[in-house]
Amino acid sequence: PRLDLLDMPRYNGSGFGVGIITKLAQAYYQTADSEKFSGQDWRIRPVEEVIEEVRNLNTEFGIQKVFFIDSGFNIPMSSAKTLCKAIIETGLRIRWNTYLRPGECDAELTGLMKESGCSLVLFAEGRSESSVTGRLKQIGNLADLCREVELPFTLNITFGEPGETGHSVQQKIDFLDNTAPAFATTRVGARVLPNTQMAQVALNEGLIKSESDLLKPTFYVAPDVRGWIADRLREESKKHPRWHLS
């Protein structure tokens, strides 16, 4: 890309930094079927290429903050560790951020991430567990690993997914309170994507007539919470300055 045509120094002081791709694959969406994020179509970028791009951004434009574009940087964990070790060994002094997906992670990886310059981790609800309790436990385990190495993290929690009730809403709010992320995004409604279980639910309940309707952004909110969930989250956001309602 012709980065020389852009005002690159501005990236050092805003946002998450300049994006660098570390892996190409089918995108991971928390509302999509989890088995589609299996890794069979992954194309992991060679570590040498990633390191070279980081180095060029630094030497040519003075960029010291980058964002590793990856829906699940920690998957596979071996590749994530290899990249972190390479950053450390080459002496690149950068700050970087990325997404982690609940599941495949350990203390060695979060320690390497911190040592290699990671300053913020973003993660959302996983879908390998069907129950709210199971998914929140996965997120909590990942949060504990980050907290042990003083690695700040953010949370994105969806409210209104199929089966959502007043009880599960309270579960999620209590979880956010207890986990205390650097900041949190609470989302009203789950995005409906084609060829997913969510799309079938939307069809069954008459939210859409066919999947062609999904050419326009469509969100599902469970009937039990539809009438009040937005107001409830708005009130919670007022009490928690670091919670953002989306």
Regions found by a protein language model. Name each.
Residues 7, 17-19, 152, 167-246:
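C-terminal accessory regions of radical SAM enzymes
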Residues 161-163:
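Short, solvent-exposed loop/turn segments at secondary-structure junctions
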